[in-house]
């Protein structure tokens, strides 16, 4: 076994910045679970999640979260621990996400595409106490991988599988839910979880996101995107990705009292059926998937008229294709450029069409600071390419 001796240090915001963010109302000193709890109180019987044949109201989601949180503590996890979580598009992703961070346990949200190399790095670098995973990716034996990770990572005490396990060392998630939930044990100033960098420079880096800063990103995004209790959001991109998690994503839907519909199959054939069945109002796509949706719409007979707008981000969307999308899908286009580190840009829903199709928007916050610089770190003239500092 390889034992990593260092721990992950977190440098908090300067006190002056923190005071300013609170004075402006950006930081509300509420945890992610607190924001979910607001919707539980105001919309207890409204549907929060639809995942295949399963569905959860906000009250049911709350109960599952707190019961699982109690089970995690009984198992041996505690506030301050880190875990690696690799769960596909299913309700358990959000249940585990909230159950962990409402107890001060910080998940590293790995993507379904990550394999042993990346997962081993996450576990060792974060000194993860647990690996929580689903096993529904074709060609990937997650349970075998879990056992390999435990051999490689001395800190990894618990392997937790969302379904039936094939080895006594792997705990089934369903056995952890306790009859009674547990009270919250987390702090809005503390790290809620670790996002992953989306760059192409080797293994993704861990990005600590606090409850305060991440909640602000979600709430500010909701205001721009008009998310409400009427929003029905189709999650076709990996649930762990920053875009469908917080821009405004599933968290935005939960905070607004709307409903998240999860798609494990991202094909347009499946997506269009779900749009018709659940009267989806918005979804987030990457450009290649947007192209597939547009192509499928030419011959599909599904009723997708409930769609109000589609977000496209993650890569540059060509102007020509962007101009075609509203006509092909009969809805508005919103372009998004976001970074897991924090900066998020949106075209506004009422922007002129040239702004919507030619740009990826402007920063969501009036206090975002951006600068385009050359190789020497000097600002470049307007219109010239360079590196983005934020």
Label each PLM-derived region with a short phrase.
Residues 1, 102-173:
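Structural core segment of the AMP-binding/adenylate-forming
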Residues 21-30, 165-191:
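Flexible, low-complexity linker/hinge segments
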Residues 44, 161, 175-198, 203, ...:
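Conserved pre-ATP/AMP-binding loop-to-beta segment of ANL
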Residues 62-68, 207-229, 236, 290-294:
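Conserved structural elements of the adenylate-forming
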Residues 280-284, 294-355, 369, 379:
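Gly/Ser/Thr-rich phosphate-binding loop
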